[in-house]
A protein has these predicted regions:
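N-terminal helix-rich structural modules
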Residues: 20-218, 239, 644
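Sec-dependent N-terminal signal peptides
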Residues: 6-11
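C-terminal motif of bacterial Sec signal peptides marking the signal peptidase cleavage site
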Residues: 14-16
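Short His/Asp/Glu-rich catalytic/ion-coordination signatures at enzyme active sites or charged loops
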Residues: 31-46, 95-114, 138-181, 241-281, ...
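C-terminal, non-catalytic "cap/extension" segments appended to globular domains
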Residues: 20-42, 46, 53, 215, ...
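Short pre-active-site segment immediately N-terminal to the catalytic Zn-binding motif
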Residues: 468-487
Length: 695
């Protein structure tokens, strides 16, 4: 999610250009209300000078810490380090937001150029021996009882100390030099991997000219495809893309089996076409470099290096957890496949269920078993109604209010900004909502920030997704899955907005990777609670509140298709772990390795991992050896929601406890300590199994 001091996830820069200091908006705090990024003044030519100036500024700040003649203390070393890098934080927050959500060729070129520069700067900090000695000195003082720190201060000190150790500060010069080379190469390879996926997404177009090929598709799907075609200069036709909001409805409803196969296979083979956008060699290099890095730092494999900082602690714990769930999920998935095959057999075509058939026949089975189809409930989920309901839920739980602002600069016209205030009227932060697809936006949904919370400084948080855009007179209508996605990402936003920490290094989502999904995933539970549905689910035309009959159907089908969904998620998590469990990457063919891994697991051919190796962007970014964390956190969130169900989903005492013990604390205490503070006990696996219908 975040890196200390500044984000290194992606980097960049254009050709250098002379720029007067006072003209570059990144050189000082933004001169806007709330200190929000001033997108009216930020231009392409500002980024490189700001990155270089930011590096210069932080180098001076680090030098001041190192040259301080006083004995190292928590304040003059750890706090000073945590506060350093103001310019870098400002430019990184904006630049990396745009490279993910609104990029173009110029930003991509900048990203590629600056990646090694920023990697080198990070190494210059964490391999700085004089700085490391001061940090280690403060760490030793606490260990020996010479200084007394608060729990939050202890966590911050420990985090920085470990960051130096895990960066190789304690290694000899030769090993440090090799680590620098590895870090630089990894940053460049990661950008190339992600760019290839974006290129593949943007290049694919399924253009339909014959309306007969649209058979089975609801009107809202056809209307959206017509708008896509019009925007692409193909008016009078229908255009489908690899974005979830376009691809999944096509797989779910289109009767044309060959076209379903077309869009499905292009999606799952991204990065695997032996062309300029191929990712096989890149991923192989990344795995080899990560393994070398882990071994230099004293670990047998990369997964154990990563997990040493997580709740799970080691690879064996994660593998035991995933394999335990695998038995439950695969058995259910096989039963579901058999049910779908029966529906196909009734059609008398003699066809065998294939992966591109699953969504289509699952929708038929849903209608048969529950008398419910997505097209029936989707009119009740307009984006604006769901948004309103989401904010009402947040208000009823935590007393906060969100008010739309029209005068805060944004990077795209369809981005909306909200002022967030607490029940007492105090300012909590700004929330940016960017919900529609565009060519420069990567797939998926995520939360991040333009500014982190620290002390009196309040955060600037954003959510990004790619929901269907309004088309003509039809508003943006969400699927039930997309409704849950909106609630999920807003849960992350709440974690970032409600945090009350003194130091940015431990605020908000700066927590263990396998804990960070708890605040997001627990929010999904409210999305389909009957009491909550009555608050926001209204027919976009008639304004009728969703009827009890439909709510009952939604509740009844809550565990429908969960064998499939859990199995594809587990398959991806196990692929991630097996790749990073490798202790030898010589002659690694990632596609062959994926097949071998899935064969050993016994994955049925009708299901592919949710992410295959060549487009598994999670493991290139912050979720390497960490994709399991969604399920790990689900153990926590399903158990935690039991507390709400026991006392009422809007029970004030329970909500206050969750806010104070989880959302406000950030990474200031051990995750399990925080969880026990809320729940009063360790989590149980049973609620997860029940929630997914696996037992």
């Amino acid at each position: 999610m975040k890196r200390l001091l500044f984000t290194l996830a992606t980097c960049c820069v254009m050709c250098a250009c002379e720029q007067k200091t006072e003209m570059n908006p990144f050189f000082t705090e933004f001169q806007t209300e709330y200190g929000a990024p001033d997108f009216t003044k930020i231009r392409l030519e500002h980024y490189e000078p700001a990155f270089l100036k930011g590096i210069e500024e932080q180098n001076a700040e680090i030098k001041a810490i190192v040259d301080n003649p006083e004995e190292p203390t928590f304040e003059n070393t750890i706090v000073a380090l945590d506060k350093s890098g103001g310019i870098l934080a400002r430019v990184s927050g904006v630049f990396f937001a745009l490279t993910e959500a609104d990029t173009n060729d110029s930003l991509t070129a900048l990203n590629e150029k600056m990646a090694p520069v920023l990697s080198e700067h990070s190494d210059n900090i964490y391999l700085n021996q004089d700085l490391y000695k001061r940090v280690a000195d403060v760490h030793q003082q606490e260990r020996e009882g010479k200084i007394t720190l608060t729990t939050e201060q202890h966590r911050l000190l420990d985090k920085y100390y470990k960051a130096f150790v895990r960066s190789g500060a304690g290694l000899d010069a030769g090993k440090q030099s090799r680590l620098r080379e590895i870090n630089k190469e990894l940053s460049t390879l990661g950008i190339a991997f992600d760019n290839h996926i974006l290129n593949e997404n943007n290049a694919y177009q399924l253009v339909i000219e014959n309306e007969a090929d649209l058979a089975g598709l609801p009107e809202w799907v056809k209307a959206g495809a017509a708008e896509e075609a019009k925007a692409a200069g193909k008016e009078g036709k229908w255009l489908f893309t690899l974005q979830n909001s376009s691809r999944l409805p096509f797989l779910q409803y289109a009767e044309n089996r060959e076209l379903r196969k077309n869009i499905y296979e292009d999606y799952i083979n991204r990065g695997n076409h032996d062309d300029a956008n191929d990712n096989k060699e890149i991923l192989g290099k990344i795995m080899a470099l990560r393994l070398e890095q882990a071994k230099l730092l004293g670990f047998d494999c990369y997964s154990n290096f990563v997990l040493d900082e997580n709740m799970a602690k080691n690879s064996q714990t994660v593998m035991d957890f995933l394999n335990n769930l695998w038995g439950y999920s695969l058995e259910n998935a096989k039963k579901e496949a058999a049910e779908l095959q029966k529906i196909m057999d009734k059609e008398g075509k003699g066809e065998k269920l294939a992966a591109w058939d699953w969504w289509y026949y699952a929708e038929k089975l849903r209608q048969e078993k529950y008398d419910l189809n997505e097209d029936e409930i989707k009119p009740y989920f307009s984006l604006e109604d769901v948004r309103s309901g989401l904010y009402t839920v947040a208000n009823k739980l935590y007393g906060i209010t969100l008010t739309e602002l029209n005068d805060v600069p944004v990077y795209e016209p369809d981005v909306k900004v909200y002022e967030v205030k607490d029940a007492d009227g105090s300012f909590l932060g700004l929330f940016y909502a960017d919900y529609f697809p565009r060519a420069g936006k990567r797939g998926g949904a995520w939360m991040s920030n333009f500014r982190e919370q620290a002390g009196e400084v309040r955060p600037l948080i954003y959510n990004v997704a790619s929901f269907t855009k309004p088309a003509g007179n039809m508003p943006s209508l969400l699927t039930l899955d997309e409704v849950e996605t909106m609630f999920h990402e807003f849960g992350h936003a709440l974690h970032g907005m409600l945090t009350k920490c003194n130091y940015k290094g431990v605020s908000g989502t700066s927590v263990a990777q396998d804990f960070v999904e708890l605040p997001s995933q627990i929010m999904e539970h409210w999305a389909v609670e009957p009491e909550v549905l009555k608050l926001y689910a209204k027919h976009y035309e008639t304004r009728e509140v969703i009827p009890d009959e439909l709510i009952t159907k939604i509740q009844n089908q809550g565990t429908f298709n969960q064998g499939f969904m859990t199995t594809e998620l587990l398959a991806a998590a196990l692929l991630d772990m097996e790749l990073h469990n490798l202790t030898d990457t010589d002659n690694l063919n990632v596609v062959a390795f994926e097949k071998e891994t899935m064969d050993k697991l016994g994955l049925i051919p009708e299901i592919a991992p949710r992410y295959r190796a060549t487009y598994f962007s999670h493991i290139i970014g912050g979720y390497a050896a960490g994709y399991y964390s969604y399920l790990w956190a689900e153990v926590l969130d399903t158990d935690a929601f039991e507390a709400f169900k026991e006392h009422g989903v809007f029970d004030k005492n329970t909500a206050d406890s969750f806010r104070k013990n989880i959302l406000e604390k950030g990474g200031t205490e051990d995750p399990m300590t925080l969880y026990r503070g809320f729940r009063g006990a360790d989590p149980s696996l049973e609620p997860l199994l029940k929630n997914r219908g696996l037992k």
